[in-house]
Amino acid sequence: SSNGWNVIPFILGEWTTNSNWDGNFWANFPQRIREANIFIQNVHALNEQGITPTEVEYMKAECRFMKAYYYALLANTYGGIPFAPDEITPSNFNLSDLMIGQTPYDQVIDWCDKELQAASKILPAKYTEARKYGRATSIMCLAVRARMLLYAASPLVNGNTDYANYKNDKGENIISQTYDASKWRKAADACKELITEAEAAGYKLYEVKMSDGKIDPFMSYQDMMFKRFDEGNTEILFARPGGCNYSYYEALATPLRSSGNGGLGVTQSLVDAFSMENGLPITDPASNYKEEGFSDADEQRDNTDWASICNGGSITRKGTYNMYCHREPRFYICVNFNNGYFNQEDRVYNMFRGDGTETDNNGTHDAPQNGYFAKKKIYYKDNVKQGSYQYRPGILYRLGEAYLNYAEALNECDPGNEEILTYLNKIRERAGVRQYTTGNTDDNYIHVNLNNQSEMRNLIHAERRVELNCEGLRYDDLRRWKEAEKVLTGPFYGMNAYGRDAASFYKRTVYQTRVYKKAFYWFPIHQDEMDKNAKLKQAPYWN
């Protein structure tokens, strides 16, 4: 796939209405929707072949689910889309029949909402037969619905007057111009329904326990990405059963001298987002964060077996830059840093610039551009050199996200509700960081003001960033919060990839300057499509 290359002009602000994107939902999804419609019209029971009327009803509901899923993705990507959910183009069609305008965003979402609810009432909550894993379930319907309604309540599409002139061929506003607070309540109710139904069906956060029965936060967060549903990972609500293309993602996060393509990293901004071991952000003076200097001993912790099983015997090694020491467990599962342990070759990473035989940074695009490798979803036993990889399900929705979705929606529609902390704390407990409380007497907790909606919003957003990092959700979060222009524009930092020794390497250094234009909140309709259909209106600010 060349998707990684496609994104370069996008992040540099060079995207145009003639730019190509491999995903191309605009072309692909209508074809799939048409196939679903044809199937629904023609499927029938064949009892002698084991296709019972019940099975037929399941398959029809699965098609309804897929149609709603595709339409929700189209609306989230393009804003206004042509919408004819039940039409099948006849073979003797006139080209003019296909030229329809765009339907307002909220109308598409309302249709998807009804279809997902209807399908959820027909489909089972899960399948016990392994061969049926991956087929649509009621829980998948409710998961797609909950995230969709959360997005639909968010500032980008809920009364966004930036789009006052974004109208379809009938003169209707494509994005609503009036803020509707009830959308947050609808989203919260959808999230809670998902959680209630999922937990009743046996779904739960994935946990690995220590011998004393306590949660191992390192192993829990790591293995949640690798264990299959039938291995007890019932946190997975919706996944691609075929797994993933390991040779690409894993190779990009493996050094070139170890047979990888070593250019996939994370930003300094993400590194800074992880809290300290005590659960406080590094910006809090009470967090004990120390950025400069080096550790004088190996770091051990008694709440995990991860160090001995996966990381060569310690959390961090003596001589590690203090920036990376005493951080929360999720940090070590997600970020590979200089002097961090590389299990494939039983050594530590060397990110200093060099000729490539003794270093992981030879200065090419196959080297860390800012002193970091991505680590999340890279199994500690993966060996790119030998082509051996741990199975990794392609998780699209998981219960941990559902908890955070619910906390966010609840904070917007019912600030002060104690369930906001309940569900935030479920995530933090599994992550091994101190939980939040409205009391202020217990050092085992962090005091917060639950009634301060803005403070809680910041905490929820921060928790999403860390818990859901590298799962494909951050970009849509920044879009829907209308923060992308601020966050994705300007200098991006890391360590100094040109540094050949500690003194020159360990400096916050700009490795890239990015540009995010107001137009980029929506993907443009490709100019070829605009030229074909005079009824289409281009996404805002692209013309």
Each predicted region: which residue ranges?
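An aromatic- and glycine-enriched ligand-binding surface/loop that stacks and positions planar moieties
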Residues: 1-2, 79-81, 85, 109, ...
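Extracytoplasmic/secreted proteins, especially bacterial periplasmic and envelope-associated proteins
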Residues: 28-38, 107, 111-118, 140, ...
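Short, well-structured active-site flanking segments
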Residues: 75-87, 157-159, 415-427
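Conserved, well-structured interaction surfaces
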Residues: 2-78, 94-133, 138, 302-304, ...
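Active/binding-pocket-proximal capping segment
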Residues: 348-349, 378-381, 400-406, 416-445
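Long, intrinsically disordered, low-complexity segments
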Residues: 29-32, 111-113, 150, 188, ...
